[in-house]
């Protein structure tokens, strides 16, 4: 029941067809999620791309995890909440550090009910339907940790964190959106697709997110690009020679 930020064409029929030809699949139970719109919402707003500038809060207006936690841990923590979503909070400095498309979506989200804006933390909380006192206390405590360079939840590189203090304040839903699948076709170092018996499937090559096993069960951020570029080049050369 999770949403996805992938393209409509990413439906996986290729994996089923390759399996029909005898290809082996690995890690098909492993998916990676990022904050995004929860089920029932369609506008994905990104206020979380800089962990030094945002916090996650639950429906009580409280932080519940370090925002730079490993992606699988973050996913499980958010989905364990009663509402199965959290909220991303930034101030105007954080908001303006994002690109124009991210800001545009947030502005649209204020109109559609997918994002909120307030001149104070209390105003923001009221717009969100959260406790004004709780959200104010959460932001104050976070800012105190930034000043002391010691985050209460152990957020790394505390000396690089930014206080959340410049109005207006912004928030959006942070549900879990499927972003990447670690599962896929089993391949070797030559980007050849392997059969269930372990040998190459003649003439079949694969690279990038179509493959599985390259990243284990928890991909590090941005490594998918390296995977696709390196093995895409190898696969292309192999296919040209086949």
Protein language model features and the residues they cover:
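A conserved FAD-binding loop/helix module that cradles the flavin
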Residues: 1-17, 172, 211-242
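Short Gly/Pro-enriched turn/cap motifs at secondary-structure boundaries
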Residues: 5-8, 44-48, 78-79, 174-177, ...
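Short, ordered coil/turn segments that flank beta-strands lining enzyme active or ligand-binding pockets
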Residues: 59-60, 189, 196, 230
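Hydrophobic "anchor" residues
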Residues: 63-64, 193, 234
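A glycine-rich dinucleotide-binding beta-alpha-beta segment and adjacent secondary-structure elements
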Residues: 134-218
């Amino acid at each position: 029941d999770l949403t996805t930020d992938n393209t409509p064409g990413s439906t996986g029929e290729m994996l089923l067809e390759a399996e029909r030809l005898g290809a082996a699949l690995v890690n098909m139970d492993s998916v990676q999620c990022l904050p995004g719109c929860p089920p029932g919402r369609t506008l994905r707003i990104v206020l979380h791309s800089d962990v030094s500038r945002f916090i996650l809060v639950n429906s009580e207006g409280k932080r519940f995890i370090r925002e730079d936690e490993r992606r699988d841990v973050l996913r499980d923590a958010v989905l364990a909440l009663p509402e199965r979503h959290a909220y991303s909070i930034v101030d105007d400095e954080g908001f303006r550090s994002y690109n124009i498309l991210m800001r545009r979506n947030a502005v649209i989200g204020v109109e559609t009910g997918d994002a909120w804006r307030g001149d104070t933390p209390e105003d923001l909380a009221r717009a969100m339907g959260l406790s004004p006192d709780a959200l104010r206390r959460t932001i104050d405590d976070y800012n105190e940790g930034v000043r002391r360079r010691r985050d209460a939840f152990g957020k790394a590189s505390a000396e690089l964190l930014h206080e959340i203090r410049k109005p207006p304040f912004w928030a959006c839903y942070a549900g879990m959106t499927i972003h990447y699948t670690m599962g896929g076709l089993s391949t070797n170092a030559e980007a050849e697709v392997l059969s269930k018996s372990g040998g190459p499937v003649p003439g079949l090559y694969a690279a990038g997110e179509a493959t599985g096993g390259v990243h284990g069960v928890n991909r590090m951020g941005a490594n998918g690009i390296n995977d696709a570029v390196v093995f895409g080049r190898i696969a292309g050369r192999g296919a040209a020679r086949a």
